[in-house]
Amino acid sequence: MKLQYKNGEEFFLKYNQFFHLVIALSLLPFGLIWLAKKKGFELTLPSETVGYVLYAVLGGIILFLFFQSIRNYKTGYKDFSKEWTLREKLDFFYSSNYKKYLGLGVATLIAVAGYLVDTSYFFIFVYVLLLFSMSIGRPAERKIEKELALSKEEIEEFRKAKEIQ
């Protein structure tokens, strides 16, 4: 995924927008389902065994997506070079974080789907844990500077509103 931006401020704004969009895409259905359940809406499972299978399958998919997203994010830095230009570094950073947040976003949507068909609080707990893990890695200028090991000149160029080459 290639991001179009002129300067560090615009990059950070677009990066933040994507992060918040991923969170909002799961918060909206979660809120609607929660409100519907408060009014008495309930999907019942045909048997208790189906519930256990649901926990296992959806829980396994969520765990896989969570760990795969984090693993891909961390292993992606093997290709990183400090010799790249600032624009190349920022593009690399966005691409690796894009994949991570996309995977975590899909995992949150699966947790919301699990909450739709289940009456226990297991999937709510999983959903909250996923949101918490996403908020730990939320966008921050210092995080970008630290992870990309930017030089003082690059930090200055990133923070100023002038165009990045």
Predicted segments, located by residue:
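Select subsegments of transmembrane alpha-helices in polytopic membrane proteins
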Residues: 17-27, 95-104
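Cytosolic juxtamembrane regulatory segments of multi-pass membrane proteins
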Residues: 91-100, 155-165
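Membrane-helix interface/capping segments
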Residues: 66-89
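Short, Lys/Arg-rich, polar N-terminal cytosolic tail immediately upstream
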Residues: 1-10
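Membrane-interface helix termini and inter-helical loops of multi-pass transporters
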Residues: 37-47
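Alpha-helical transmembrane segments and their membrane-interface junctions
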Residues: 32, 102-123
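Alpha-helical transmembrane segments and their immediate juxtamembrane interface regions
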Residues: 125-162
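Hydrophobic alpha-helical membrane-embedded segments
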Residues: 54-73, 130-140
